[in-house]
Swiss-Prot record:
Name recorded for this polypeptide: Putative flavoprotein monooxygenase
Organism superkingdom: Bacteria
Taxonomic lineage: Bacteria, Bacillati, Bacillota, Bacilli, Bacillales
Keyword tags: FAD, Flavoprotein, Monooxygenase, NADP, Oxidoreductase
UniProt function note: FAD-binding protein that may have monooxygenase activity using NADPH and/or NADH as an electron donor.
Cofactor(s) the protein needs: FAD
EC number: 1.-.-.-
Native organism: Staphylococcus aureus (strain Mu50 / ATCC 700699)
Residue numbers binding FAD: 14, 34, 41, 52-53, 110, 307, 319
One example GO MF annotation: flavin adenine dinucleotide binding
């Protein structure tokens, strides 16, 4: 039975980025447990899906590539692409993991975690591990919100090119909803999009709320080319039924529409459905309760990292946001372990805007 200082669950952007940062702070006894292979969720993106944040090798000027998980790497440099596919990003993660010689156990499913007096016992499908600290980096992509009996969730689509030309309904009015509408419309389909709210024209400057320029630009271009996309706002879906070869979508207003094709659900994800999250964290109404250290309120030395972290209304749903917490948490571990502070390392992360120790600084405000 292996005992390690740190166990990270999940070998995605957050898990690999955290492991690299821990090494920079002198914590090297780290393992990563991954149920599939490195970049598992990215490999399951629809083939046409791209990162909405652009990659550019701005490293060296205090602002690393927005999609980089470490200060000295850049997907733009490695792949010469600005908006990267899921498959390519997974390849980037593998390249980085190899470069930093991370200790990753693939095809290892965590089945249970129990607390002992001085450490945690992690049972998996391959072996049992002990760890003093646990970082949960499982994300939410494997837990789509599917509130209705019918509907294809965006995350379940392998390739939009497999859809025949026709009339489609998309439910959801943010990034994945508009991306689905764009992908189908550019192939000649007619799209009716229904949503209760949308970030399309939101005045909030925060890109976690407002539709990204990349999505907005693609949407505008395809509409200029004659695409037919009908947007319906303030519609809340109550139910979806299927009979007589038609999908019937009913809204809480009493209105309804029908479509011959199964509706596409761009309804987001729910990390609280993850059994690991349910076991280790207090959850209420799709919200994961965390301390100001992104630590579980149920167990000490168990942390949440990645896009699922929300703290003081700050949503860390982009890589450039959540990577800024890695060094803060690594520094916290050195303090708890009584290790000497690595001030040069801390300052280096601070200079590269990767040391977010105050969530009150996260408010996004633009005058024009």
């Amino acid at each position: 039975m292996q005992h390690h200082k740190v166990a990270i669950i999940g070998a995605g952007a957050a898990g690999i980025g955290m492991a690299i940062t821990l090494k920079d702070f002198g914590i090297t006894d780290v393992i990563i447990l991954e149920k599939g292979t490195v970049g598992h969720s990215f490999k399951h993106w629809p083939k046409s899906t791209r990162t909405i944040t652009p990659s550019f090798t701005s490293n060296g000027f205090g602002m690393p590539d927005m999609n980089a998980i470490s200060m000295d790497t850049s997907p733009a440099f490695t792949f010469n692409e600005e908006h990267i596919s899921g498959e390519t990003y997974a390849e980037y993660l593998q390249v980085v993991a190899n470069h930093y010689e991370l200790n990753i156990f693939e095809n290892t499913v965590v089945t249970n975690i129990s607390a002992d007096d001085a450490y945690y016992t992690i049972a998996t499908t391959t072996e049992t591990y002990h760890a003093d600290y646990i970082f949960v980096a499982t994300g939410d992509y494997n837990f789509p919100k599917k509130p209705f009996k019918y509907g294809i969730h965006y995350s379940e689509i392998e390739d939009f090119d497999n859809f025949n030309k026709g009339q489609y309904v998309v439910i959801g009015g943010n990034e994945s909803g508009f991306d689905a509408a764009y992908q189908l419309a550019k192939n000649g389909s007619d799209i009716a999009l229904y949503t209760s709210t949308t970030g399309l024209n939101d005045p909030d400057a925060d890109p976690s709320v407002r539709l990204s320029p990349y999505t907005r630009q693609r949407l505008g271009n395809v509409i200029k080319q004659g695409a037919r996309i009908e947007m319906n706002v303030h519609y809340t879906v109550k139910d979806i039924d299927f009979n007589n070869g038609q999908y019937h979508i009913s809204f809480d207003s009493g209105q309804s529409v029908h479509t011959p094709h199964e509706p596409i659900l761009a309804t987001g994800f729910d990390a609280t459905k993850n059994p690991i999250v349910q076991q280790l964290f207090v959850t209420t109404n799709q919200d994961i309760k965390l301390t100001t250290h992104d630590e579980s309120t149920r167990y000490p030395n168990i942390f949440m990292i990645g896009a699922t972290v929300e703290n003081d209304n700050a949503k860390l749903c982009y890589i450039y946001k959540f990577r800024a917490r890695f060094a803060v948490l690594a520094h916290l571990l050195t303090q708890r372990e009584g290790l000497p502070a690595k001030q040069e390392v801390i300052e280096n992360y601070q200079k590269n805007q990767m040391y977010l120790d105050d969530y009150s600084c996260c408010e996004v405000s633009c005058t024009c």
